[in-house]
Amino acid sequence: MTKLITTVKEMQHIVKAAKRSGTTIGFIPTMGALHDGHLTMVRESVSTNDITIVSVFVNPLQFGPNEDFDAYPRQIDKDLELVSEVGADIVFHPAVEDMYPGELGIDVKVGPLADVLEGAKRPGHFDGVVTVVNKLFNIVMPDYAYFGKKDAQQLAIVEQMVKDFNHAVEIIGIDIVREADGLAKSSRNVYLTEQERQEAVHLSKSLLLAQALYQDGERQSKVIIDRVTEYLESHISERIEEVAVYSYPQLVEQHEITGRIFISLAVKFSKARLIDNIIIGAE
């Protein structure tokens, strides 16, 4: 049965005992409202590690002034049940006051990796992500940490953080988990109307179009962006916020494509902003 831990002190006590015995720890940091994408990461960790820890913590530092921290869905009982069914050992669910007992004396600032895509639209968001992931890594001390490729910019930033701060953890990127029709699984999908849900499937279809263009030899980003945008505009009635091509994991905007690339989409529906992406090309 999955154990619920609610304090930093108790979590650290358990981790220290596990480390002394040579136990491997797999870690999945989340903000809760779990779905199959999260559970895929939990299953991967359970199959690899002696102990799997899932954090459920809605981090206030990654919410901007126009983003409602209080409205973010919280369902700890359901989340606990879900991860228990797939074999997680511990859910770490600390209070905000325990994670941030006072004003932080040191600000962590992400560099150019946060100046594009989601980071450009949500200033300070990735500073908050890196701060909380640093704290969680120090508390949980995982051997392996699992992040979804759906948030590919976040994955690239966390990998850079691990390198820059010498964290003794290996980051495992997990492929996007999709519905049967291709829509990327997301906690935000529940906010879609019936018509929006039907239209949302075209995000993934437009990425398959981009992949086909690349495989046919197209290397001009503008051509791919224009074709994908045209497809989305003909199939989605909502606002298309972004179609972009960047190198990966460097996140440098590409004009003439060389090497590995990251094609990113963002569409604003009435009550949900959905993102999707595909990473293609040689590393």
Swiss-Prot record:
InterPro entries: Pantoate_ligase, Pantoate_ligase_C, Rossmann-like_a/b/a_fold. The active site is at 38 (proton donor). GO terms for biological process: pantothenate biosynthetic process. GO terms for cellular component: cytosol. It is found in: Cytoplasm. The lineage of its organism: Bacteria, Bacillati, Bacillota, Bacilli, Bacillales. Pathway: Cofactor biosynthesis; (R)-pantothenate biosynthesis; (R)-pantothenate from (R)-pantoate and beta-alanine: step 1/1. Homodimer. Keywords: ATP-binding, Cytoplasm, Ligase, Nucleotide-binding, Pantothenate biosynthesis. It catalyses: (R)-pantoate + beta-alanine + ATP = (R)-pantothenate + AMP + diphosphate + H(+). One of its GO terms (molecular function) is pantoate-beta-alanine ligase activity. ATP binds at residues 31-38, 148-151, 177, 185-188. Beta-alanine binds at residue 62. This is Pantothenate synthetase. HAMAP family: PanC.
